[in-house]
């Protein structure tokens, strides 16, 4: 029960041919959206159809269709050529057997046999190989031969001079001192700008701090110079921070215009600054020590001079440093 008769080879070939034709014919039917109008196939569908038909024609010309497989698409079904089977007569069969028997009798017997070879010994010890002798394989290689001893003169490591260490410490102290004075001067400039800002918004007769009468034991003082402990101290440094941010914003805007160079003003400004830097760099000394001495001298003059002189020296320092950068 439930058993089916076995299919013959011809039936299986016909079924396989039908499956192959179904797969090839499925590629020729357009699938999905054809075009925006839905009437004509797209170029991809046409090319796929042409490629499929070429494959079908190639298989048909080669006679690869099994028997009965061409009925699905109406193609011609050439029958494959059968291989002719050799027909032997009893006399020819007897002659072949006699010839093979004589060949076996006249064949020379095997006299020598090759004994099975033992696996090679990859690890050779000194004395096992006559070519090596008492030396190992690494010792005979020219890359591993020991070179004659060369006398090496060892020099003691150079001790650091005391002057170099002292110079580094002195340079660090000078850097800290200059940074401290620069911070003080920046705060002083910010306080002057804060004072100018307050003078524009307050009358001259009312420049006293409004927080000195809040009950704290603080001596009378002006706005912008509040000591530690006065409630106006935090407001003063808040104004200084806002002024500093405004200066950074203006500087960033100028740098943006200078880097882009999209406006005529930026191009003219860059051309004038380049000409100024080139003229200043031509006047600067080429010795690095002289340049460092010049910059240090200008810094000392700036830190110990009045406001007008400080402004001029600051501009000179900026021009000098910019010229150094432009020259390098």
Swiss-Prot record:
<dbReference type="GO" id="GO:0046718">
    <property type="term" value="P:symbiont entry into host cell"/>
</dbReference>
<keyword id="KW-0261">Viral envelope protein</keyword>
<keyword id="KW-0812">Transmembrane</keyword>
<dbReference type="GO" id="GO:0055036">
    <property type="term" value="C:virion membrane"/>
</dbReference>
<feature type="topological domain" description="Extracellular; in external conformation">
    <location>
        <begin position="2"/>
        <end position="163"/>
    </location>
</feature>
<feature type="transmembrane region" description="Helical; Name=TM1; Note=In external conformation">
    <location>
        <begin position="164"/>
        <end position="184"/>
    </location>
</feature>
<comment type="similarity">
    <text>Belongs to the avihepadnavirus major surface antigen family.</text>
</comment>
<feature type="topological domain" description="Cytoplasmic; in external conformation">
    <location>
        <begin position="185"/>
        <end position="236"/>
    </location>
</feature>
<keyword id="KW-0449">Lipoprotein</keyword>
<keyword id="KW-1161">Viral attachment to host cell</keyword>
<feature type="lipid moiety-binding region" description="N-myristoyl glycine; by host">
    <location>
        <position position="2"/>
    </location>
</feature>
<feature type="transmembrane region" description="Helical; Name=TM3">
    <location>
        <begin position="283"/>
        <end position="303"/>
    </location>
</feature>
<keyword id="KW-0945">Host-virus interaction</keyword>
<comment type="subunit">
    <text>Large internal envelope protein interacts with capsid protein.</text>
</comment>
<dbReference type="Pfam" id="PF00695">
    <property type="entry name" value="vMSA"/>
</dbReference>
<keyword id="KW-0325">Glycoprotein</keyword>
<keyword id="KW-0597">Phosphoprotein</keyword>
<feature type="region of interest" description="Disordered">
    <location>
        <begin position="63"/>
        <end position="128"/>
    </location>
</feature>
<feature type="modified residue" description="Phosphoserine; by host">
    <location>
        <position position="118"/>
    </location>
</feature>
<dbReference type="GO" id="GO:0019031">
    <property type="term" value="C:viral envelope"/>
</dbReference>
<feature type="region of interest" description="Pre-S">
    <location>
        <begin position="2"/>
        <end position="161"/>
    </location>
</feature>
<keyword id="KW-0946">Virion</keyword>
<feature type="glycosylation site" description="N-linked (GlcNAc...) asparagine; by host">
    <location>
        <position position="260"/>
    </location>
</feature>
<comment type="function">
    <text>The large envelope protein exists in two topological conformations, one which is termed 'external' or Le-HBsAg and the other 'internal' or Li-HBsAg. In its external conformation the protein attaches the virus to cell receptors and thereby initiating infection. This interaction determines the species specificity and liver tropism. The large envelope protein probably also assumes fusion between virion and host membranes. In its internal conformation the protein plays a role in virion morphogenesis and mediates the contact with the nucleocapsid like a matrix protein.</text>
</comment>
<comment type="function">
    <text>Truncated S protein may be involved in translocation of pre-S domain through the virion membrane.</text>
</comment>
<feature type="compositionally biased region" description="Polar residues">
    <location>
        <begin position="76"/>
        <end position="88"/>
    </location>
</feature>
<keyword id="KW-0472">Membrane</keyword>
<feature type="topological domain" description="Cytoplasmic; in internal conformation">
    <location>
        <begin position="2"/>
        <end position="236"/>
    </location>
</feature>
<feature type="transmembrane region" description="Helical; Name=TM2">
    <location>
        <begin position="237"/>
        <end position="257"/>
    </location>
</feature>
<keyword id="KW-1133">Transmembrane helix</keyword>
<dbReference type="InterPro" id="IPR000349">
    <property type="entry name" value="HBV_HBSAG"/>
</dbReference>
<feature type="topological domain" description="Cytoplasmic">
    <location>
        <begin position="304"/>
        <end position="328"/>
    </location>
</feature>
<dbReference type="GO" id="GO:0016020">
    <property type="term" value="C:membrane"/>
</dbReference>
<keyword id="KW-1168">Fusion of virus membrane with host membrane</keyword>
<keyword id="KW-0519">Myristate</keyword>
<feature type="compositionally biased region" description="Basic and acidic residues">
    <location>
        <begin position="92"/>
        <end position="109"/>
    </location>
</feature>
<protein>
    <recommendedName>
        <fullName>Large envelope protein</fullName>
    </recommendedName>
</protein>
<dbReference type="GO" id="GO:0039663">
    <property type="term" value="P:membrane fusion involved in viral entry into host cell"/>
</dbReference>
<feature type="topological domain" description="Extracellular">
    <location>
        <begin position="258"/>
        <end position="282"/>
    </location>
</feature>
<feature type="site" description="Cleavage; by host">
    <location>
        <begin position="238"/>
        <end position="239"/>
    </location>
</feature>
<keyword id="KW-1162">Viral penetration into host cytoplasm</keyword>
<keyword id="KW-1160">Virus entry into host cell</keyword>
């Amino acid at each position: 029960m439930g058993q089916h008769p076995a299919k013959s080879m011809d039936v299986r070939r016909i079924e396989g041919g039908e499956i192959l034709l179904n797969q090839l014919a499925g590629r020729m039917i357009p699938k999905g959206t054809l075009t925006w109008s839905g009437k004509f196939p797209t170029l991809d569908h046409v090319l796929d159809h042409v490629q499929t038909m070429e494959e079908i024609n190639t298989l048909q010309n080669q006679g690869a269709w099994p028997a009965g497989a061409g009925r699905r698409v109406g193609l011609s079904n050439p029958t494959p050529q059968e291989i002719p089977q050799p027909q032997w007569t009893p006399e020819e069969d007897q002659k072949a057997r006699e010839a093979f028997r004589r060949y076996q009798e006249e064949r020379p017997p095997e006299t020598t046999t090759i004994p099975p070879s033992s696996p090679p010994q990859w690890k050779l010890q000194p004395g096992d190989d006559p070519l090596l002798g008492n030396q190992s394989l690494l010792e005979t290689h020219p890359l591993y031969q020991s070179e004659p001893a060369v006398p090496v003169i060892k020099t003691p490591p150079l001790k650091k001079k005391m002057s170099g260490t002292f110079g580094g410490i002195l340079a660090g102290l000078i850097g800290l001192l200059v940074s401290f004075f620069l911070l003080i001067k920046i705060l002083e400039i910010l306080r002057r700008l804060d004072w100018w800002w307050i003078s524009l918004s307050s009358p001259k007769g009312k420049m006293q701090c409004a927080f000195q009468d809040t009950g704290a034991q603080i001596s009378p003082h002006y706005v912008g110079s509040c000591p530690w402990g006065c409630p106006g101290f935090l407001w003063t440094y808040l104004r200084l921070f806002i002024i500093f941010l405004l200066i950074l914003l203006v500087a960033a805007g100028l740098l943006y215009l200078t880097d882009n160079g999209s406006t005529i003003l930026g191009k003219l400004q860059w051309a004038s600054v380049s000409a100024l830097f080139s003229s200043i760099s031509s006047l600067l000394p080429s010795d690095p020590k002289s340049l460092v001495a010049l910059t240090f001298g200008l810094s000392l003059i700036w830190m110990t001079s009045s406001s007008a002189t400080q402004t001029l020296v600051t501009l000179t320092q900026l021009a000098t440093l910019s010229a150094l950068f432009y020259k390098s």
